[in-house]
Amino acid sequence: MPVDKNLRDLEPGIHTDLEGRLTYGGYLRLDQLLSAQQPLSEPAHHDEMLFIIQHQTSELWLKLLAHELRAAIVHLQRDEVWQCRKVLARSKQVLRQLTEQWSVLETLTPSEYMGFRDVLGPSSGFQSLQYRYIEFLLGNKNPQMLQVFAYDPQGQARLREALEAPSLYEEFLRYLARFGHAIPQQYQARDWTAAHVADDSLRPVFERIYENTDRYWREYALCEDLVDVETQFQLWRFRHMRTVMRVIGFKRGTGGSSGVGFLQQALALTFFPELFDVRTSVGVETRSSQGNAGTAGS
């Protein structure tokens, strides 16, 4: 159908009798969603709307990310490798979206932000329940974080549930054990509330996988999927820190933290340390023995 006079006619099949029927806005509950942006500044500061929407949309993406990571854990428990890889691929794209979103907030100048910062009171992104929940799902577990949510018993209970359950990485290690890899017994049952720290006893397992990718392709592919997720998560953390630095400099955070300094510390946290450490040792012994053999025969 050609377009005439820069107008597009409605096609005959398009529904226009929508009284009492499910509509786009009704399905998405847009009346509730789009009425949730309520600036507190008086008169309303123009840029507070940007600040609110930035964080609300981030929380929506975090909700999806948590949904996908929980699914990945279930798939691993069921030994469903390809289904797990699918949701991890989606998780990576969600993190990319979250990372790129900071470019919108970066258009906020320091003076614009200071124009409404006081109305935020002690509220802070540090108090994002979903962010902490995702950290726990990925293995960055810190029981101290429960204190922040004492005001929200239901949310605190949800966070505690994730704290006390195996993380995504721990379920991956249990998956490897079921398929004959020499995972130490402690990873079958331990205090799941403790954060995972780098463990040299796991390195031979991953060296074997990374040095024999044809034989262990499924395991290798899952390792790389996890590396992708952590890399993208760290890029998001880094972009967050740089955006805060750009907008407020080195002022203290609204929630009482040191601000940029506190965010910088998060960049040193890791989810899957052995998957990065193994790259240092892969092939080293092989190359060393080959080099020694060559010297002896010369």
Swiss-Prot record:
InterPro entries: Trp/Indoleamine_2_3_dOase-like, Trp_2_3_dOase. It comes from the Bacteria. Substrate binds at F51, I52, I53, Q54, H55, Y113, R117, T254. SUPFAM superfamilies: Indolic compounds 2,3-dioxygenase-like (SSF140959). Heme binds at H240. Its EC number is 1.13.11.11. Pathway: Amino-acid degradation; L-tryptophan degradation via kynurenine pathway; L-kynurenine from L-tryptophan: step 1/2. Keywords: Dioxygenase, Heme, Iron, Metal-binding, Oxidoreductase, Tryptophan catabolism. Signal peptide: none annotated. The keyword Oxidoreductase applies. Binds 1 heme group per subunit. The keyword DNA damage does not apply. One of its GO terms (molecular function) is metal ion binding. It catalyses: L-tryptophan + O2 = N-formyl-L-kynurenine. Homotetramer. Heme-dependent dioxygenase that catalyzes the oxidative cleavage of the L-tryptophan (L-Trp) pyrrole ring and converts L-tryptophan to N-formyl-L-kynurenine. Catalyzes the oxidative cleavage of the indole moiety. Belongs to the tryptophan 2,3-dioxygenase family. PANTHER family: TRYPTOPHAN 2,3-DIOXYGENASE (PTHR10138:SF0). This is Tryptophan 2,3-dioxygenase. It comes from Xanthomonas axonopodis pv. citri (strain 306). The lineage of its organism: Bacteria, Pseudomonadati, Pseudomonadota, Gammaproteobacteria, Lysobacterales. The gene is kynA.
